[in-house]
């Protein structure tokens, strides 16, 4: 769907984006993560055709020349004419994107229904809450049925209920198009994304599948629970270190690798212990993200 190779953007003596390369596949949701100033918004604006890259290649559906009719874009702070109603604004936006008046009216009702604003279609935008404006921006980005949707911090201004609803919309949208979104809300990325791209100082620090990222950054911390008493016996194992007992039958500790975990389970069986829980600590995306950006 989208291929980015060696993308760079410079402003005089400042390199905002340095040699960025990644791919977004059809019906895939990719999260672009990174601290403030990492180059996320600049990258998204180049992909949307709003900024020209200093160098590098962007291909959409194999074509170097971006067809902006195939792209939907929601900026972090969407701007509206406050005196317009949602219906008027979407008609205006649709006509600018080349839709006929009749087609606009057909699509507007559908989009307002999808984003949950159908009851506010004739209310002036100046009276909208921040969350309602974000939804209207999403409706505008989807009006012309793009193949590739770019969302810059789409849930940053929303309350928990609004955030959940927008994430639910994103899950539905990726069935029909490719989605690339930036966010600081790492838990939200964990809910909807297939791939992650982590940027730092204008460069990519890591990219790939979320599960692969977690596995690469995983610690060797394990939890073991048994019906019997662990205390005293566990210390005898030379491959077990940093033991912390939650209670006499449950402990958290470190092992050098998963093979040591298998050895420990074998020792438990030989000892006649009844294992009720044995698991390796799974890190959240936030834990992994902090490791990558502070590396």
Curated annotation (Swiss-Prot):
GO terms for molecular function: ATP binding; ATP hydrolysis activity. Gene3D superfamilies: P-loop containing nucleotide triphosphate hydrolases. Disulfide bonds: none annotated. Pfam families: ABC_tran, DrrA1-3_C. Its EC number is 7.-.-.-. Keywords: ATP-binding, Nucleotide-binding, Translocase, Transport. ATP binds at residues 34-41. It comes from the Bacteria. InterPro entries: AAA+_ATPase, ABC_transporter-like_ATP-bd, ABC_transporter-like_CS, DrrA1-3-like_C, P-loop_NTPase. Residues 2-226 form the ABC transporter domain. Induction: Expression is sigma Y-dependent. Induced upon nitrogen starvation. PANTHER family: ABC TRANSPORTER RELATED, ABC TRANSPORTER, ATP-BINDING PROTEIN. Belongs to the ABC transporter superfamily. This is Uncharacterized ABC transporter ATP-binding protein YxlF.
């Amino acid at each position: 769907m989208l291929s980015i190779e060696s993308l760079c953007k410079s402003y005089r003596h400042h390199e905002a984006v340095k040699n960025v390369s990644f791919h977004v596949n059809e019906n895939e949701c990719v999260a672009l993560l990174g601290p403030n100033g990492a180059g996320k918004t600049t990258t998204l604006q180049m992909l949307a055709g709003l900024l020209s890259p200093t160098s590098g290649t962007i291909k959409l559906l194999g074509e170097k020349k971006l067809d902006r009719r195939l792209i939907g874009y929601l900026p972090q702070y969407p701007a509206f004419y406050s005196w317009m109603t949602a219906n008027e604004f979407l008609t205006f936006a649709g006509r600018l994107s080349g839709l006929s008046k009749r087609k606009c009216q057909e699509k507007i009702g559908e989009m307002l229904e999808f984003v949950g604003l159908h009851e506010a279609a004739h209310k002036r935008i100046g009276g909208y809450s921040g969350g309602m404006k974000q939804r209207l921006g999403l409706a505008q980005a989807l009006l012309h049925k793009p193949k590739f949707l770019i969302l810059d911090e789409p849930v940053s201004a929303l309350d928990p209920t609004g955030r959940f609803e927008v994430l639910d919309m994103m899950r539905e949208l990726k069935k029909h198009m490719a989605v690339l979104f930036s966010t600081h809300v790492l838990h939200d990325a964990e809910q909807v994304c297939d791939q992650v791209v982590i940027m730092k100082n204008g460069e990519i620090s890591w990219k790939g599948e979320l599960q692969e990222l977690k596995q690469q950054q995983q610690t060797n911390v394990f939890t073991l629970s048994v019906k019997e008493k662990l205390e005293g016996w566990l210390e005898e194992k030379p491959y077990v270190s940093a033991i912390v007992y939650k209670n006499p039958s449950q402990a958290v500790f470190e092992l050098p690798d998963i093979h040591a975990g298998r050895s420990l389970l074998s020792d438990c069986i030989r000892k006649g212990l009844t294992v009720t829980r044995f698991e390796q600590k799974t890190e959240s995306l936030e834990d992994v993200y902090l490791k990558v950006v502070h590396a």
